[in-house]
Amino acid sequence: MRPRYSLILSAMRLIRPSNRRLSSIASSDSEFISYMKNKAKSINKALDNSIPLCNNFVPLWEPVLEVHKAMRYTLLPGGKRVRPMLCLVACELVGGQESTAMPAACAVEMIHAASLILDDLPCMDDDSLRRGKPTNHKVFGEKTSILASNALRSLAVKQTLASTSLGVTSERVLRAVQEMARAVGTEGLVAGQAADLAGERMSFKNEDDELRYLELMHVHKTAVLVEAAAVVGAIMGGGSDEEIERLKSYARCVGLMFQVMDDVLDETKSSEELGKTAGKDLITGKLTYPKVMGVDNAREYAKRLNREAQEHLQGFDSDKVVPLLSLADYIVKRQN
């Protein structure tokens, strides 16, 4: 076992036997995929309604219409809807209703879509394929894409504030907005992307430093918005501080696991299978989990993160927690 791999495993807590019993109640793959599709259907409908192409049947002003088209292009089709689904499930887990968290769930997905648009720009990751189709700037141009990204983040705040009309207290709504703001800025996505860009030209003194940098980068770039989805959902559902913290810890593990598997698939699958450019990180010399610890060890780390995630769900209702257990299993097994 490589020293750098043993470092990261030593940081993981031992999994108690009770966690194995909890994981055994996760639904089957087919049941969960059906569950995901049903949730995604509700989410997609809400997202579609959030960005109209007309106003009371009157076409939008042409410049605004073009921005709306760009927003919809990245937001609506494709995507697993992991983040908004997590937001809804977290709300339900602590006793809330799906409808209560739907605006916030849409907001989280809008922030995610906005970040994808920026990440794909030539000055950032310079990608031309996303979800099996040309990236936003390839279709609408860089200027309109940047405007669309800005508009999506603004709309995310507006969506969350609309939760007050659903009976959510202003205090909870404010807390949710603060959590989203944290996830977007230099405590979250911005920091992660900056670290990703800097990592391309950075040298490390030893393997441990390289691994620590990689982990910190993806805590910010990937895991932070997954955390925000769970936290905001629990806030909307009226969860206690303890419940919110446990869901946040679960979501951090899930977010890191998602990135580990994303890196693995980038090296082991084709562009056609992934719906995006495969192998690009390897070509550009970016830090990835397979590069640091190898593909097999990266897969093993993802499995350990899965068990760690399940540990944080101890004590929740055994029926309501099934979707979260199944989500973690789904991510560690995913093929695209």
From Swiss-Prot:
It comes from Arabidopsis thaliana (Mouse-ear cress). Catalyzes the trans-addition of the three molecules of IPP onto DMAPP to form geranylgeranyl pyrophosphate. Mg(2+) 1 binds at D119, D125. Pathway: Isoprenoid biosynthesis; farnesyl diphosphate biosynthesis; farnesyl diphosphate from geranyl diphosphate and isopentenyl diphosphate: step 1/1; Isoprenoid biosynthesis; geranyl diphosphate biosynthesis; geranyl diphosphate from dimethylallyl diphosphate and isopentenyl diphosphate: step 1/1; Isoprenoid biosynthesis; geranylgeranyl diphosphate biosynthesis; geranylgeranyl diphosphate from farnesyl diphosphate and isopentenyl diphosphate: step 1/1. Its cofactor is Mg(2+). It comes from the Eukaryota. One of its GO terms (molecular function) is dimethylallyltranstransferase activity. InterPro entries: Isoprenoid_synthase_dom_sf, Polyprenyl_synt, Polyprenyl_synt_CS, Prenyl_diphosphate_synthase. The lineage of its organism: Eukaryota, Viridiplantae, Streptophyta, Embryophyta, Tracheophyta. This is Geranylgeranyl pyrophosphate synthase 6, mitochondrial. GO terms for biological process: carotenoid biosynthetic process; farnesyl diphosphate biosynthetic process; geranyl diphosphate biosynthetic process; geranylgeranyl diphosphate biosynthetic process; isoprenoid biosynthetic process. Pfam families: polyprenyl_synt.
